[in-house]
Amino acid sequence: METQITVKVKLKFQSSETAPNFTKTMELYRQACNFVSDYVFNHDFEFKQSHLNKALYADIREKFKLKSQMAQSVIRNVVARYKTVRTQMARKPCRYQDTNTGEWYSESRDLTWLRKPINFNRPQVDLQRGRDWSYRKDGILTINTIHGRAKVVPICHGFNQYFDGTWKFGMAKLLKSGNKWYLHISATKEALDFDKQQVKHVVGIDRGLRFLATTFDEKDKTAFFDGKAVMRKRAKYQKLRAELQSKGTKSAKRRLKKLSGRENRWMTDVNHQLSKTLVDKYGANTLFVLENLDGVSFERTDLPKTLRNQNKSWAFYQLEQFLTYKAHLNNSEVVEVSAQYTSQRCPKCGVIKKDNRNHALHEYHCENCGYTSNDDRIGAMNIQELGKMYISGTERPKFEKLTTNA
């Protein structure tokens, strides 16, 4: 099994010509991406590399002066972006309400829903190891530009640990943030295949807002990771964002862009810390179980207005990504299970009833057997139960609705 991570390296220049060369190369690469994107959009989303090469390669080389490998990279990058958008659209179907009956319906979406080609706004360059970038024995990174290779010094704590022979490097992405330059390098490492027979811990994880995560394990131990501080900070960001949007000035738009980057970096750090805490707590041979949230709506009218936006923008998927790669590096696994009925099912008697959950009190009370507990804990308990079913051999465990035993 391969584990993939992204190594983020800050770059220090040795020549005053490096920054302008990087800037020019990135801008031409961006323009080439938009050129290819227009073609893909207007040709029924053609993704075959051979067809796109035949139609566009010569034009990319001539119009944008990109080297051979960069021209190929442009095509791959555009195709990858469209495929990512296709996946995102499939995960979030269109929901609409029938004005006559009041019932809600879902309709799956695909790329034909796009009204215009995907636009590449941010200048960047995708670089292939060897031909476009390399790391020398003297600690210098060399990066290809339209004016030849540039030499830069990598600044990254623990960067040398990835050169112990166990990691393989692939594509790298050249980026600029403010006045600082970065290289994001894709690295993969072979990890031991996860063995269900060696599992020591099965941990159900319910993700949310009030609690970032609620966990329940095989020892019946529950842990709550408080999200109130995160909610307050996100509400603060939302207030600042609304104030800047109401101004509409150029300076306000610049501040909005910086604010968005700051919020994303902060939230990324929160998810990194939380995923690290979970992996460190349980160690190797742990199965972390998450509910599959594809197509799940988070429209919550019971939340205050200030928190509804947070609910929509919550980075559940990012937390899952971080937890997955950290678990793989620690000989553990993350599995998704069906979210159906996990918040409605009594973990003691198995009866499923929506009204047993009280959102206002954050409580679950089973009318059948009388079991009562925190509603987030109930979710984690049910998710953990599905994890045990997975370990026992059920490939896609889910709950079937039962009526009361009475």
Residue ranges and their predicted role:
Residues 1-406:
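Nucleic-acid substrate recognition interfaces
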